[in-house]
């Protein structure tokens, strides 16, 4: 057994049941650690019934801090951070393992929406102008071509960062670049991880030979004040840390 799979949950009971019911058949192949951020529903009970080892937090620590709590509670050489709404293809872990053994990197399968369309989880440099273009500001739309690159056809492509919904790496690689920055409660912590990897020469990869579905429903596509507060707060933290991206 080489893999620790770490999932951070918060009121995630519905997506756990629909995406992780397969785990018990594979429980001898890898450890599944669920860090629960003080859910108010029956997430903990469902995770335990599915075979996960559950770590209960008495408060909502946020995504990065939850990932780090799971990381400190694990010990195997390979780590996969996987959202509760991610549909893992467990047989693909062998392919990810081969990539991680070849080089120091962060790597994810290509993610798909539930309807099979591409979900571009590998992104280019997160210049502020590119982020604004992605939010619909047309004056910067020329930035989107490099920010939202087309995945390689049946191969591996190098990007700047990958969505935190699915990140695999070696434990020793995380020790080199550092774990998740807990200053971000949610949003931008995956941008930050990718930027730190880039600076240290650690590649960030998307493997389009592997395709996993992700039930992505970003809260900031609606009028959710909690989500927007943390989006703006995390953006301020991020661009203060990387002022070279303010263009």
State the predicted function of each range.
Residues 126-160:
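Short, flexible, basic/aromatic active-site loop/helix in glycosyltransferases
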Residues 87, 91-121:
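Conserved donor NDP-sugar-binding/catalytic core segment of glycosyltransferases
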Residues 12-26:
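Short, well-formed alpha-helical segments that are part of the catalytic scaffolds
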Residues 16-17, 41-49:
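Acidic helix N-cap motif at the loop->helix transition within catalytic regions
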Residues 57-74:
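Glycine-rich, basic loop-to-helix element that forms the pyrophosphate-binding segment
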Residues 160-211:
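A short, conserved alpha-helix in the catalytic core of glycosyltransferases
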Residues 79:
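Short aromatic/hydrophobic "clamp" motif used to bind/position activated sugar donors
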Residues 36-44, 59:
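A conserved acidic beta->alpha catalytic loop
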